[in-house]
Design a protein with these regions (language model features):
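Acceptor-binding helix/loop patch of EC 2.4 sugar-transfer enzymes
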Residues: 12-14, 23, 87-95, 116, ...
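Nucleotide-activated donor-binding/catalytic signature segment of Leloir-type glycosyltransferases, i.e.
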Residues: 281-292, 301-324
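A short, well-ordered alpha-helix in the C-terminal region of glycosyltransferases
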Residues: 397, 404-419
Length: 437
């Protein structure tokens, strides 16, 4: 065969088509949602694949149906396919479970109508029943299936509802679906080493795998911070500790509020004591620390009431789009990853943005993997969860030691550039999929 004929045949060979399945993604002109699967779809197309990004008609963050006829969902590098889903109003209730069940059923019907279309299926888990449809269909049609494990259900659910016997019965379907997915998968991508290793508990055969943090688009973060920096006004001499994310069951904002109140009382007492003794200049400066809470969620009203009761220097700024959030984080002095003791989350979505800010991080999460990373990489300090006094101690140490903040912040930014920038880190996913097709 001559070179010209070989080249012509190679050019005529159809590009492998991958189904990327996610029930939660920010698309088009939407302002809320995760970008992981959108960015991955774009990169797969750039790397020589055709992609159907299959997602829900229901926008999880807005809790509303999408207008799927909008032009912003068309003309993209990948093909967007919407699966009908009735929707729900809360993140954890029976309505959401039923909604995902309907979506899984409709996804199965869609796969059956398009049999032979895909060379590989890639989906997130959870939702477990949606992932099970993907895994079983791929197995039946002898094509690879790869799970993107970004949370553990039902383990995470037990943190909210843990009633002996009753919880076991209620969560049995989730455990059953997860086990089936883990047994059938051809490969796994986890957003932490813990998640990547989870399928091994339910199978004996090894599987190709990669740990790829959720991360962020570092260039977009920096651009958003530049564009919105003028909107953030910071009084001279004031330090900010910032939390960005959901105000819900997993995230321990109550302890952060109590710690802020305690720290302000300490500062006031210190100022009065040193002023009376005439020794203020002999001590390290003790600047006021204000806590800025970016985000929204079901616990917001309760937390606002707690802040008022504690007379805590805390401001609730509500939901911010990514550019505004980047500006607030860049203007901060300390970032706080505040989780309850029972939280099973490992390396959560916000970590990439915290590190990108170039500011030190306080971590109250209990994940051994992430606590070790905080210490080993040197970008922050770990604190025992649900301990206001311990959190106030660390806030004070960072507030009164500018050099430590600078060193830790620089280390965090370096980690963001090396491990959390989606445009480079996601190449590991692309390569894993390429090797399976």
């Amino acid at each position: 065969m001559n070179t010209q004929t070989y080249t012509q045949r190679a050019q005529a060979r159809p590009r492998p088509r991958i189904a990327v399945v996610t029930m939660g993604v920010k698309l088009g002109d939407e302002t809320r949602g995760y970008t992981r699967f959108r960015v991955l779809s774009e990169m797969l197309v750039e790397q020589g694949f055709d992609v159907d990004l299959i997602t829900s008609s229901f926008q999880h963050w807005e809790k509303a149906q999408r207008d799927t006829s909008k032009t912003c969902y068309q003309g993209l590098p990948y093909n967007v396919v919407f699966i009908d889903e009735p929707g729900y109003t809360r993140n954890l209730d029976l309505q959401r479970i039923r909604s995902h069940h309907v979506a899984a059923k409709n996804l199965r019907e869609r796969f059956e109508r398009t049999a032979g279309r895909y060379s590989l299926i890639y989906s997130e888990i959870p939702p477990n029943d949606v992932a099970r449809v993907c895994a079983e269909y791929a197995s039946e049609h002898n094509i690879p299936y790869v799970a993107d494990i970004n949370d553990l259900w039902p383990e995470a659910m037990r943190m909210v509802v843990n009633i002996p016997v009753l919880s076991d019965v209620a969560f049995c379907p989730f455990a059953r679906d997860a086990k089936r997915v883990y047994q059938l998968l051809s490969g796994a991508v986890g957003t932490s080493d813990e998640y990547t290793a989870r399928p091994a508990k339910d199978r004996t055969t090894p599987y190709p795998h990669a740990t790829v943090y959720v991360g962020n688009d570092l260039a977009a973060f920096d651009e958003g911070a530049r564009e919105h920096m003028a909107d953030v006004v910071k009084p001279a001499g004031e330090l900010w500790a910032v939390y960005a994310g959901t105000l819900g069951a997993s995230y321990d904002l109550a302890t952060l509020i109590k710690a802020a109140a305690l720290l302000e009382k300490r500062r006031a007492a210190h100022t009065a004591r040193t002023a009376a003794a005439g020794t203020a200049r002999q001590h390290r400066p003790f600047p006021p620390v204000k806590v800025k809470i970016l985000g929204d969620g079901p616990d917001r009203q309760r937390l606002e009431e707690l802040a008022w009761q504690e007379n805590a220097p805390v401001e609730f700024l509500g939901y911010q789009d990514h550019g505004s959030m980047a500006a607030w984080l860049r203007a901060s002095d300390i970032t706080v990853n505040s989780l309850v003791k029972s939280a099973v989350q490992s390396i959560v979505t916000k970590i990439g943005d915290y590190l990108a800010s170039g500011k030190p991080m306080i971590n109250t999460g209990s994940s051994p993997e992430f606590r070790n990373k905080v210490t080993t990489d040197g970008f922050g300090l770990n604190v025992e969860a649900e301990n206001p006094g311990a959190l106030a101690d660390v806030l004070e140490e960072l507030a009164r030691t500018p050099s430590l903040r600078k060193i830790m912040g620089a280390r965090g930014r370096a980690v963001a550039e090396r491990e959390f920038d989606q445009r480079t880190s996601y190449l590991a996913i692309v390569n894993l999929l390429r090797n399976l097709i």
